[in-house]
Amino acid sequence: SFPTRRSSDLFNRAFARAGLDQSVVRLSLMIGEDVLCASGSGATTGLYTACGYFESLPTEVNMGFGSHYLQRFGSAAPALNNIGESCYEGLLLLTALAQTARSLEVAAIDRARSNVAYQGPRGEVVMRGAHTRQPVYLASADQLEFDVIAELTP
């Protein structure tokens, strides 16, 4: 992910130096708080993204997740972002699948998957067939953080 982040932060800084951030809105997908930090607060004006998770997401579960993360890893730990949180969500999903199936066997999990739902930092995640249905949020960059402005619904 470093080359992608590096390309994004270089682009954001060049965009701001050219003055385009004052008149052109950008929608960049699959960026996280790490890109904002690498870009610098002066290069994030007019930047939006859509994602399933933001560190600033105002859900009760996310506030607890962030608090536990800070307690465990300290203030010098990397910012929580969509990539790291997705790894955590994967473990939550596996736990919910195994609990519903009452087994770790693939066949049992496969049979149980359509009855699985859980609450995670991003909100409620529900299995529908072989896919998850989960919230996606629109956020605007506010210097080095994202401000979640809407939940996008299908």
Question: Can you say where each PLM-predicted feature lies in the sequence?
Answer:
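N-terminal start-of-chain detector that recognizes signal peptides
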Residues: 1, 19-27, 66, 93, ...
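Short, small-residue-biased leader/transition segments that mark boundaries at the very start
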Residues: 2-7
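Extracytoplasmic/secreted proteins, especially bacterial periplasmic and envelope-associated proteins
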Residues: 10, 60, 64, 68, ...
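Tryptophan-centric aromatic hotspots in well-structured domains and transmembrane helices
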Residues: 11-12, 54, 93-94, 146
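A generic local structural motif
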Residues: 12-15, 125
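Segments of small-molecule ligand-sensing domains
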Residues: 71-84, 95-146
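Cytochrome P450 catalytic core segment centered on helix I
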Residues: 149
